[in-house]
Amino acid sequence: MAAPMELFCWSGGWGLPSVDLDSLAVLTYTRFTGAPLKIHKTSNPWQSPSGTLPALRTSDGKVITVPDKIITHLRKEKYNADYDLSARQGADTLAFMSLLEEKLLPVLIHTFWIDAKNYVEVTRKWYAEAMPFPLNFFLPGRMQRQYMERLQLLCGEHKSENEEELEKELYQEARECLTLLSQRLGSQKFFFGDAPASLDAFVFSHLALLLQAKLPSGKLQAHLRGLHNLCAYCTHILNLYFPRDGDEVPLPRQTPAAPETEEEPYRRRTQILSVLAGLAAMVGYALLSGIVSIQRTSPARAPGTRALGLAEEDEED
């Protein structure tokens, strides 16, 4: 008997089954199709077989990490939400997927990862509290830099060199995109009628994050909340497909203090050694990945003196 497929994705929060755009899209598609997956929700990407989230481990042990490729594999396994779509609807799916990536995704990245107030009070706060130590000290900042690079690639076609003008242009296009989605949805349950398709999984993941997060700076969020059919659309999908999901990451259980036994010193020593081993592994990873670099000082300094330079920006709250 073949091993079951396994999906590794980011944990839930803000009333959503996952706080990550890609993880939420894949999770939603699997609920639409009823794909039999063993789902691992985690706030530690190192628990994924690829070291990234989301990731699908197939029944033959292959690991797939790109959301589009994960969905393509599920289609090959006969879990196809687009099976009944016409050729015209298939073309519309491609057009709206491009619209989401070009017009809405850049502003979502800006809203959650670039806007200083939102990043500090919402995004970094969630990841820093959810991630295990010591990942929570450097990984949110590393993710932010990756999203900055992704945003630069997405905005390559925009000619404005003024940052304020560029931001204004991006938000205007995102508002137009939301309005167009609202008009296309109309009074339907889903974008192509009464049954959900892959487009619904991606639209929902983009809208739900923006709708559910409590953002101190929510310019686009205010526009979305004014489009009542899109809000009802998100609520309908959450209630129908994720009725028991979306809780915040549970806090570690507090166990009552027990009297110290003869084995307690040995247990403590084992715990300390485990922590030290974990820290050593983290430092090794940081050195290999370039997060931390060791630079030799100039000859003018005393022999043997070294300078430890942090290659990444400070992650202090």
From Swiss-Prot:
The chain crosses the membrane at residues 272-292. The keyword Magnesium does not apply. There is a cross-link at residues 38, 41, 78, 168 (Glycyl lysine isopeptide (Lys-Gly) (interchain with G-Cter in ubiquitin)). Its main location: mitochondrion. Ubiquitous. Higher levels are seen in the kidney as compared to other tissues. One of its GO terms (cellular component) is mitochondrial inner membrane. Gene3D superfamilies: 1.20.1050.10. It is found in: Mitochondrion outer membrane. One of its GO terms (biological process) is protein transport. Ubiquitinated by PRKN during mitophagy, leading to its degradation and enhancement of mitophagy. Deubiquitinated by USP30. Keywords: Isopeptide bond, Membrane, Mitochondrion, Mitochondrion outer membrane, Protein transport, Transmembrane, Transmembrane helix, Transport, Ubl conjugation. Signal peptide: none annotated. Interacts with MTX2/metaxin-2. Associates with the mitochondrial contact site and cristae organizing system (MICOS) complex, composed of at least MICOS10/MIC10, CHCHD3/MIC19, CHCHD6/MIC25, APOOL/MIC27, IMMT/MIC60, APOO/MIC23/MIC26 and QIL1/MIC13. This complex was also known under the names MINOS or MitOS complex. The MICOS complex associates with mitochondrial outer membrane proteins SAMM50, MTX1 and MTX2 (together described as components of the mitochondrial outer membrane sorting assembly machinery (SAM) complex) and DNAJC11, mitochondrial inner membrane protein TMEM11 and with HSPA9. Involved in transport of proteins into the mitochondrion. Essential for embryonic development. Belongs to the metaxin family. This is Metaxin-1. It comes from Mus musculus (Mouse). The gene is Mtx1.
